[in-house]
Swiss-Prot record:
GO terms for MF: mRNA binding; rRNA binding; structural constituent of ribosome
Protein name as annotated: Small ribosomal subunit protein uS3
Pfam entry (one): Ribosomal_S3_C
Protein's UniProt keywords contain rRNA-binding: yes
Any single GO BP term: translation
Subunit annotation: Part of the 30S ribosomal subunit. Forms a tight complex with proteins S10 and S14.
Region (Disordered): 222-244
Length: 244
């Protein structure tokens, strides 16, 4: 089961919180569709900002959007001009007041979304896939990850028949629900077709009770950074030593 299911959805309510926090009632379908439009727009609009996660919280008249990124300066802009422009664009989509919080991911090498997107962009830039994967694995393990697994699928090296190749280092225990496994899927559009990149990163294990509410909701007002480290783990977070 753990090998097939999405590791993030498998840990919701255990060690991982939800990315959409609101009560929809009878308008649940419309609200969910609006969330999907917001995420799709932000991912396209902020493609160069290395966006890791988008958390949406709603009240009756206000939508609070927290954007986790490793390059907050691109989103904020000079004097906060870019983030103000982004707020106005989102108001047209939602017809509601929008507040945007920017959370800086301090260790992007431990974020599966950022790692997967970086590999995909390198593949589009005609860099050899083995080199891109080995560089990603080395930088992730250097930052203290317990393990990483990367799978690339498609017409690798322009081969006529598509295939999948998997590279891994360390441990990624997908069946252990207390294991903090981050997962992401990215796509690279190349001349020979579409290549899929899947990344699993094990960042240790979580012991004891964990607050599932978004830990970055205390981010500063619009256009300011949160000084917490990316990942923002609580005090109960412990890493298993390598000799265990």
């Amino acid at each position: 089961m753990g090998q097939k299911v999405n590791p993030i959805s498998n840990r919701l309510g255990i060690i991982r919180g939800w990315d959409s926090n609101w009560y929809g009632g009878k308008n649940y379908g419309d609200t969910l569709l609006e969330d999907s439009k917001i995420r799709k727009y932000l991912n396209a609009r902020l493609a160069k900002a290395s966006v890791s996660r988008i958390v949406i919280e709603r009240t009756l008249k206000l939508i609070t959007i927290t954007v986790c990124t490793s390059r907050p300066g691109i989103i904020i802009g000079k004097g906060g001009q870019e983030v103000d422009k982004l707020k106005e664009e989102l108001k047209k989509i939602t017809d509601k007041e929008v507040q945007i919080n920017i959370f800086e991911v301090k260790r992007p090498e431990l974020d599966a979304v950022i790692v997967a997107n970086n590999i995909a962009r390198q593949l589009e830039g005609k860099i050899a896939y083995r080199r891109a994967v080995k560089m990603a694995i080395a930088s992730t393990m250097r930052m203290g990850a317990e393990g990483i697994k990367i799978q690339i699928s498609g017409r690798l090296n322009g081969a006529e028949m598509a295939r999948s190749e998997m590279y891994k280092e360390g441990r990624t225990p997908l069946h252990t629900l207390r294991a903090d496994i981050d997962y992401a899927l990215a796509e690279a559009l190349t001349k020979v077709g579409l290549l899929g990149v899947k990344v699993w990163i094990c960042r240790g294990e979580v012991y004891g009770k964990r607050d599932l509410a978004p830990s970055f909701t205390a981010a500063k007002e619009t256009g300011r950074r949160n000084d917490n480290a990316g990942g923002n783990r609580d005090k109960n977070f412990k890493r298993k030593r390598a000799n265990r």
